[in-house]
């Protein structure tokens, strides 16, 4: 069943209808005052819908709701209708919260300035502004803003924390705040002061309530007929006090009187304390509420409730059709009157006649069953059959009528909510089979019903009505509401590449050509494939579940390490979070402290789980603890330019972290257990290579017929081939270079060529090619001219090694070497023992053999470790590092136009068709290019801010070549 409550569903419908009306040129049929009520109610509904979406952590949709409400407020102003300034202020505050959660600091500052222009002492705006300025590195301005906020709410923990952080960064002395003594008075439930203390500057503004003065009489129209018998018979229903129907959620709103069918009224009697906030009934408030409720007796409606044919008559004059009544829900649901036309018109005659005629067949046995449930705000069924207080819904807005505005639709009868047996409705709530059900059609097919229909790659036809026994072994799909109605095959997601970025369409397919790697291409062939692959990678879509299996993704640590390689270990979190990042393990001499040579933190109290992947570079991925607020999805900011919220972000910051969260959510495994499993995985790998239990696939028979060895990479650059010393701690040259993974190179010699060749690590490209080819420059006997890491093999030996590693899922050169050693074990057991065991035989152990391997600084952008301040400064000032700050592999796919020149305006000569400079022109050639330049500038600014925050850029370094234009706007 759907989790959306009936109240919220009605509100969404009212929003949709309200937007349709104000976008039309039709004049409003009521007075100006009634039109003002209508627009304010629409703004209120958009605000409350935005709040509900915010609680679901859908920031984008929430922003859309708040922005729509603000736009309508501007529209109302043009109609000489005033939306209260307090509501405008709250809309901006809540939109600011969304922007802050998404890391859009420029948007946060823009909205904060608007709010502060309306109310200079708004604490939430001051706090959000300070936080955004802090994230952008403008600490002095941030401190000035939070100082004003601190004076207003000195006890708010978030304000205190931010104030202290900024004071530390600015070098200010942190003063302990004075706390006044408070009188020990018993607080009254619902007391405003108590309530204020429970709200934080981090919270959004609560839902808007309906003000009492907006219960305006409706437009006078010909009234439909009600039966005398309906009035007289329903009058016999006994009425119970409102407090007997619990639990209730009642808003402080224009509470309508309980209008009975005979026109009488029963006022809503409710303690004022409980009219404050229907969502917060906790502790003592709940106890007081329960104590005030009388015992409920099940009241059975008399069997003679409705009998015989109903004669129509005019409505009793004592039964007012107010805006509050016509929009009223069952009393079990918390509700604000919707901005629907049903508030201003009486029910349509045709709908009431349908209702009255349907009552002929209404029996007592059915009434008790069908009057059983309504839906609360949270979607929980509330039993209302014990209550005899019946409030009637209007038959819906005029947009649902076939006679209004020329819109043809089936007439609705909302009385079916109460008299379910009178109007039979088939249940349309079906549990979605997959998360794309709202936008995509996915089906199972086979080679018989999904057949090739043309010469092109995507030429397939689906025969849905063919009579056959479908194997259902092919997933096909298409996007709804698009012109292209053809079904596309959705291939299995490529899993051999450890790729975290967005998927892209194959260039050959996009150019309407045949794919060179047809069927094996790791690029997508259609948008449907991209959408399914993206969800599959996140773990949100399971083909097994869609094809009828149990749908569980049984992740284990072994499976994660097979897919992502590397290992899980514990590092010191304080060192890891330091700016710039430092890498410290547990100290071998003192197990209670970290291995940092200067600041030794308590390791157990500050340890964090980290996934380490050593390839051509070293990549550390922090695995944060999983909790209820974590979202099982990748953070789009982290993928693009680095998330400024860091550990406060609820989204996963790497694919391996996402997989760990999914595993923890399913199994509850702890970080300690993950680290132990990782250690056991590598122990098994060393003890039983090529064990199928560990690698998941048997090593290809007939290992490469080559000799393999490691040499010192630093010496190799100077033309020297130097192997390690017998302890494998340093190279055997006089320089004594450290023998670590990132400082050694592999060389192989084939039996045929009898020549040692250098082997580079396997390319870490997003899309691994089907086969590796020789570099054209090398094949022609020239030197490779490619700037960077050429992904083509530079020798036949390198091509063989890469192909073997790709086909066997081996990413690490060290792992490849270990496998080769194992394959040679039977022939050269003595040599292997001396090479694989680092401390075999009687050796003299020097103190330096056990020296702690520490990394003073680590650049996560380049994957480079630096062991001194001088080396670090040299690295962050290098051109290669600066290019890494701004450049990503996805840039060639994301952008279509030239790189921004720094002049963000359109070329007048180009618009006149006379620009002679072409691509050399410093101005934008068209709106599309200008828009992309502005978007690209914003993305580059975010990357720059992230790099500055992590101290990956020198504080006074403004020399960034073509990127220097970014510094004009930052200071």
Curated annotation (Swiss-Prot):
The coiled-coil regions, if any, are: 924-952
Q: Where are the TPR repeats?
A: 43-76, 89-122, 124-156
Q: Which UniProt keywords apply?
A: Coiled coil, Metal-binding, Nucleus, Phosphoprotein, Repeat, RNA-binding, TPR repeat, Zinc, Zinc-finger
- Which is a GO BP term held by this UniProt record? miRNA processing
Is Metal-binding a UniProt keyword of this protein?
Answer: yes
Q: Which residues carry this modification: Phosphothreonine?
A: 210
One Gene Ontology term, aspect cellular component: nucleus
Q: What is this protein called?
A: Zinc finger CCCH domain-containing protein 7A
Q: Which gene name belongs to this protein? A: ZC3H7A
């Amino acid at each position: 069943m759907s989790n959306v409550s009936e109240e919220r569903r009605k509100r969404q419908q009212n929003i949709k209808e309200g937007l349709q009306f104000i976008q039309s040129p039709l004049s409003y049929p009521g007075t100006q005052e009634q039109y003002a009520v209508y627009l304010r109610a629409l703004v209120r509904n958009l605000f409350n819908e935005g709040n509900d979406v915010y609680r679901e952590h859908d920031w984008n949709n929430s922003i859309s709701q708040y922005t729509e409400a603000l736009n309508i407020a501007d529209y109302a102003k043009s109609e000489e209708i005033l939306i209260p300034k307090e509501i405008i202020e709250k809309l901006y505050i809540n939109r600011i919260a969304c922007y802050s959660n998404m890391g859009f600091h420029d948007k946060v500052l823009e909205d904060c300035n608007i709010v502060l222009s309306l109310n200079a002492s708004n604490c939430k705006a001051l706090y959000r502004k300070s936080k955004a300025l802090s994230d952008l590195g403008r600490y002095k301005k941030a401190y000035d803003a939070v100082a004003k906020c601190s004076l207003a709410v000195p006890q708010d923990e978030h304000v205190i924390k931010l104030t202290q952080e900024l004071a530390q960064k600015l070098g200010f002395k942190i003063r302990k705040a004075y706390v006044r003594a408070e009188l020990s008075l018993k607080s009254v439930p619902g007391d405003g002061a108590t309530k204020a203390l429970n709200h934080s500057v981090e919270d959004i503004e609560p839902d808007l309530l309906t003000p009492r003065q907006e219960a305006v009489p409706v437009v006078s129209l010909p009234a439909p007929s009600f039966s005398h018998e309906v009035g007289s018979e329903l009058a016999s229903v006994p009425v119970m006090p409102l407090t007997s129907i619990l639990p209730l959620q009642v808003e402080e709103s224009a509470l309508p009187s309980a209008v009975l069918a005979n026109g009488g009224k029963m006022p809503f009697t409710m303690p004022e304390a409980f009219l404050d906030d229907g969502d917060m009934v906790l502790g003592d408030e709940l106890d007081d509420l329960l104590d005030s409720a009388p015992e409920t007796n099940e009241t059975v409606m008399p069997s003679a409730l409705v009998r015989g044919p109903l004669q129509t008559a005019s409505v009793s004059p004592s039964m007012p059709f107010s805006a509050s009544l016509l929009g009223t829900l069952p009393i079990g649901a918390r509700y604000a009157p919707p901005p629907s036309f049903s508030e201003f018109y009486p029910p349509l005659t045709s709908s009431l006649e349908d209702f009255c005629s349907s009552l002929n067949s209404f029996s007592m046995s059915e009434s008790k069953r069908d009057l059983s449930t309504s839906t609360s705000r949270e979607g929980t069924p509330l039993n209302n059959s014990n209550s005899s207080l019946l409030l009637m819904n209007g038959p819906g807005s005029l947009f649902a009528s076939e006679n209004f505005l020329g819109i043809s639709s089936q007439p609705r009868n909302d009385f079916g909510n109460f008299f379910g047996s009178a109007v039979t409705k088939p249940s349309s709530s079906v549990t979605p089979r997959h998360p794309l059900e709202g936008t995509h059609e996915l089906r199972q097919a086979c080679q018989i019903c999904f057949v090739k229909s043309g010469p092109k790659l995507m030429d397939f036809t689906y025969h849905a009505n063919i009579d056959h026994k479908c194997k259902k072994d092919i997933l096909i799909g298409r996007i709804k509401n698009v012109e292209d109605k053809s079904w596309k095959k959705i291939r299995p997601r490529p899993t051999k590449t450890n790729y975290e970025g967005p998927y892209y369409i194959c260039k050959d397919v996009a150019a309407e050509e045949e794919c060179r790697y047809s069927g094996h291409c790791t690029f997508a062939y259609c948008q449907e494939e991209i959408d399914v692959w993206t969800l599959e990678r996140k773990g949100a879509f399971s083909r097994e579940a869609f094809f009828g299996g149990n749908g569980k993704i049984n992740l284990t640590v072994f499976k994660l390490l097979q897919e992502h390689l590397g290992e899980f270990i514990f590092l010191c979190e304080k060192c890891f979070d330091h700016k710039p990042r430092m890498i410290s393990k547990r100290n071998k001499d003192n197990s209670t402290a970290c291995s940092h040579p200067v600041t030794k933190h308590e390791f157990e109290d500050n340890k964090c789980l980290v996934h380490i992947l050593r390839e051509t570079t070293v990549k550390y991925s922090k695995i944060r603890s999983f909790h209820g607020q974590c979202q099982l999805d990748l953070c789009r900011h982290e993928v693009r330019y680095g998330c400024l919220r860091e550990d406060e972000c609820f989204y996963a910051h790497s694919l391996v972290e996402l997989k760990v969260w999914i595993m923890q959510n399913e199994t509850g495994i702890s970080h300690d257990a993950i680290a132990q499993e990782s250690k056991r995985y590598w122990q098994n790998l060393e003890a039983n290579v090529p064990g199928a239990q560990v690698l998941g696939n048997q090593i290809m028979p007939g290992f490469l017929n080559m000799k393999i060895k490691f040499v010192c990479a630093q010496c190799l650059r100077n033309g020297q081939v130097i192997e390690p010393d017998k302890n494998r701690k340093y190279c055997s040259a006089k320089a004594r270079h450290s023998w670590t993974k990132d400082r050694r190179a592999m060389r192989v010699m084939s039996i045929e060529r009898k020549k040692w060749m250098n082997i580079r690590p396997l390319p870490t490209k997003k899309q691994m090619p089907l086969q590796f080819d020789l570099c054209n420059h090398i094949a022609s006997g020239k030197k490779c001219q490619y700037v960077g890491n050429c992904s083509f093999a530079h020798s036949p030996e390198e091509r063989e090694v890469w192909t073997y590693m790709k086909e066997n899922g081996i990413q690490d050169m060290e792992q490849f070497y270990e496998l080769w050693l194992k394959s040679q074990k039977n022939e050269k057991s003595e040599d292997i023992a001396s090479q694989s065991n680092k401390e075999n035989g009687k050796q003299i152990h020097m103190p330096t053999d056990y020296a702690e391997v520490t990394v003073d600084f680590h650049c996560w952008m380049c994957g480079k470790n630096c062991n001194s301040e001088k080396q670090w400064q040299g690295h962050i000032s290098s051109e290669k590092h600066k290019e890494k700050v701004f450049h990503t592999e996805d840039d060639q796919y994301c952008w279509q136009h030239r790189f921004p020149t720094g002049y963000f305006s359109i070329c007048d000569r180009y618009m006149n068709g006379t620009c002679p400079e072409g691509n050399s022109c410093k101005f934008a050639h068209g709106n599309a290019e200008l828009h992309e330049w502005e978007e690209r500038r914003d993305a580059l600014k975010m990357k720059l801010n992230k790099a500055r925050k992590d101290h990956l850029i020198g504080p006074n370094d403004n020399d960034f070549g073509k990127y220097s234009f970014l510094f004009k706007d930052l200071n």
